[in-house]
From Swiss-Prot:
UniProt main location, coarse: cytoplasm
Similarity comment text for this entry: Belongs to the RimP family.
NCBIfam families noted in UniProt: PRK00092.1-1
Keywords attached to this entry: Cytoplasm, Ribosome biogenesis
Record's protein name: Ribosome maturation factor RimP
GO cellular component, one term: cytosol
Gene3D superfamilies in the record: Ribosome maturation factor RimP, C-terminal domain, RimP-like superfamily, N-terminal
UniProt source species: Pseudomonas putida (strain W619)
Domain of life: Bacteria
Protein role: Required for maturation of 30S ribosomal subunits.
Pfam families xrefs: DUF150_C, RimP_N
InterPro entries in UniProt: Ribosome_maturation_RimP (IPR003728), RimP_C (IPR028998), RimP_C_sf (IPR036847), RimP_N (IPR028989), RimP_N_sf (IPR035956)
CDD domains tied to this protein: YlxS_C
Amino acid sequence: MGASPIFYLHSMHEGVQVSSKLEQLQALLAPVVEGLGYQCWGIEYVSQGKHSVLRIYIDKEGGILVEDCEAVSRQASAILDVEDPISSEYTLEVSSPGMDRPLFTLEQFASHAGEQVKIKLRTPFEGRRNFQGLLRGVEEQDVVVQVDSHEFLLPIDSIDKANIIPSFD
């Protein structure tokens, strides 16, 4: 069997407004989370019409308890009330990343190489937005995923959402 074909997607970043909002929220909230002794695994801001959801994923060695989420929620709420970065109504959720943990950064993708992932792109590539396969790793600013016998290089900026698919073996 010959070498697997490699596909590369280059995408201009859409959703700049959401991206800058996420960057603003990350800059505001990551120090709060880390100051409490947790890792800020990632932040999601999902606008759903008049109402939005702000999710903060936290992690630490040994796992996360409900009390950990409460502590981060209290501190994050206080900062959000003072800084007021979100003008519309929203719900704040604080959670552990869980078994199907979302992946946000190149470092997270690299550390989970060898695991099965589900990736959704912002815009279609090769007629598809959804990829499910083996996470091969990272090359520069690209996430490498193998779907069947095809390898795809997906720029981190083109990824809308990515999650680990838990293995129950």
